[in-house]
């Protein structure tokens, strides 16, 4: 069976005008279920989650291409306490400090925007949402035993594992997600770092 992957994620900026929200950005978020381009999005706040937090993540999700979202069966936007409690139930304490992870084709994100005294911006959140969705893509396009990245792409990883990022060098799954995110958000940078990897992502089906 495939291994469960758990990965990093983050948050950002207010979507109030786009979402039709006229209330204060500090208004507490309420639990609800939304659909974005066919993907169920479950808002699971705690007492500290603001509507600004949620609107930021919704904006980042909407910005992702449809081909990357089509295999995703659900995105859970969780307040920090809800995120930690769920992670502990499933994985113990190991993932308490992460900002997100995936289980199969579901994505779980911690919606806390403030990290170590600073606030994450929209670009940071788009980056991490894309990273998680590439893990879903990797999982969904593999088979019962292996992720997609564990086939031909594994050769590219082994040739130069540190070419994309320090985190990407961890293993082929992270290399794939980091490279895919760069392909979407900074394609020229990916070309400079590893043209063969860029060409691989260029050849992937995107329908």
Question: Can you name each region flagged by the protein language model?
Answer:
Residues 10-17:
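Bacterial N-terminal signal peptides
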Residues 37-105:
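Auxiliary, metal-adjacent structural segments of Zn-dependent hydrolase domains
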Residues 150-207:
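Metalloprotease/metallohydrolase-associated module, dominated by Zn2+-dependent proteases
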Residues 81-128, 136-140:
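Active-site scaffold of zinc-dependent metalloenzymes
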């Amino acid at each position: 069976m495939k291994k469960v992957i758990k990965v990093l994620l983050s948050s950002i900026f207010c979507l109030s005008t786009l979402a039709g929200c006229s209330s204060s950005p500090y208004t507490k978020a309420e639990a609800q279920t939304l659909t974005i381009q066919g993907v169920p999005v479950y808002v699971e706040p705690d007492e500290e989650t603001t509507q600004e937090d949620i609107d930021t993540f919704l904006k980042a999700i909407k910005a992702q291409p449809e081909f990357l979202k089509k295999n995703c069966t659900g995105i859970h936007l969780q307040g920090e306490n809800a995120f930690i409690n769920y992670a502990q139930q499933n994985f113990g304490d190991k993932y308490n400090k992460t900002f997100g992870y995936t289980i199969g084709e579901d994505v779980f994100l911690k919606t806390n925007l403030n990290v170590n005294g600073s606030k994450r911006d929209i670009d940071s959140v788009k980056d991490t949402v894309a990273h998680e969705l590439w893990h879903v893509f990797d999982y969904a396009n593999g088979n019962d035993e292996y992720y997609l990245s564990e086939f031909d792409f594994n050769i590219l990883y082994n040739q130069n594992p540190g070419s994309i990022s320090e985190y990407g060098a961890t293993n082929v799954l992270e290399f794939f997600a980091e490279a895919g995110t760069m392909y979407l958000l900074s394609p020229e940078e990916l070309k400079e770092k590893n043209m063969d990897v860029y060409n691989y992502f260029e050849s992937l089906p995107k329908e």
